[in-house]
């Protein structure tokens, strides 16, 4: 009887389940797709005909440009610190109104010497050194789109490339501002000519997760006092 009741309850709950509706996110291309221009077809030149002398460089919103990413950077720094401090204090009472010859003055002190009553010295020394070296090298080729044309004629570009191999995502994102005159005749531009460049090359997957320390190790490193 209990099994029958449980079966009825399960069927009732299954019938009340709401079907999950997947929300479609607009693609990158749809977000930047410009409105198609309208042309009047003539008897000689059609709208789809390419001009005889046409510059194929990107110039309008939505046009594609090829970016040659060549980023090389190296830096090194070295620091050395050496400090030392010495202090010495001594005191003696060779003459004290004739009392230094009195046997009662130093009677309570064993082996007391008035010429050497107090002596102290301190010595502090610290040495430290450090060095750091960093080198980066990123070579890639990707295409980007003109997202906006500024009033001064410069272009805002943005590109994204996602490559997935064996459930490992490699994501390359580029953003920046370029000048039209820096674009070569073959519609390419070097990343060194991009102002306010933001280049990100990251990865998601098992390999990327294994390269990061665990959460407990991060906590121990944060609170470890030594």
UniProtKB/Swiss-Prot annotation:
Keyword tags: Bacterial flagellum, Cell outer membrane, Lipoprotein, Membrane, Palmitate, Signal
Protein name from the UniProt record: Flagellar L-ring protein
UniProt source species: Geobacter sulfurreducens (strain ATCC 51573 / DSM 12127 / PCA)
Superkingdom: Bacteria
Signal sequence annotation: 1-15
Subcellular location: Cell outer membrane; Bacterial flagellum basal body
Cited HAMAP family: FlgH (MF_00415)
Assembly, per entry: The basal body constitutes a major portion of the flagellar organelle and consists of four rings (L,P,S, and M) mounted on a central rod.
BP GO terms, sorted: bacterial-type flagellum-dependent cell motility
Family per record: Belongs to the FlgH family.
Lipidated positions per record (S-diacylglycerol cysteine): 16
Membrane topology: Lipid-anchor
PROSITE patterns the record matches: PROKAR_LIPOPROTEIN
Keyword Protein biosynthesis: no
Functional description taken from the UniProt entry: Assembles around the rod to form the L-ring and probably protects the motor/basal body from shearing forces during rotation.
Entry's Gene Ontology molecular function annotations: cytoskeletal motor activity
Lipidated residue numbers (N-palmitoyl cysteine): 16
Cellular compartments per GO CC: bacterial-type flagellum basal body, distal rod, L ring; cell outer membrane
Transmembrane segments: none
Predominant location: membrane
């Amino acid at each position: 009887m209990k099994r029958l009741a449980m079966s009825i309850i399960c069927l009732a709950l299954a019938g009340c389940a709401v079907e999950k509706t997947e929300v479609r996110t607009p693609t990158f291309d749809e977000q930047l797709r410009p409105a198609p221009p309208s042309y009047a077809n003539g008897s000689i030149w059609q709208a789809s005909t390419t001009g005889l002398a046409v510059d194929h460089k990107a110039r309008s919103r939505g046009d594609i440009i090829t970016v040659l990413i060549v980023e090389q950077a190296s830096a090194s720094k070295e620091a050395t610190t050496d400090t030392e401090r010495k202090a010495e204090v001594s005191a003696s009472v060779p003459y004290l109104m004739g009392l230094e010859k009195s046997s009662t003055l130093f009677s309570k002190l064993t082996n007391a010497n008035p010429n050497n009553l107090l002596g102290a010295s301190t010595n502090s020394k610290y040495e430290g050194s450090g060095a750091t070296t960093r080198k980066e090298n990123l070579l890639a080729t990707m295409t980007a789109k003109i997202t906006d044309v500024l009033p001064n004629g410069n272009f805002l570009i943005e590109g994204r490339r996602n490559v997935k191999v064996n459930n490992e995502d490699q994501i390359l994102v580029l953003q920046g501002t370029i000048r039209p005159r820096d674009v070569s005749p073959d519609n390419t531009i070097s990343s060194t000519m991009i102002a306010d460049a933001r280049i990100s090359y990251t990865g998601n997957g098992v390999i990327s997760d294994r390269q990061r320390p665990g959460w407990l190790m991060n906590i121990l490193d944060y609170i470890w006092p030594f």
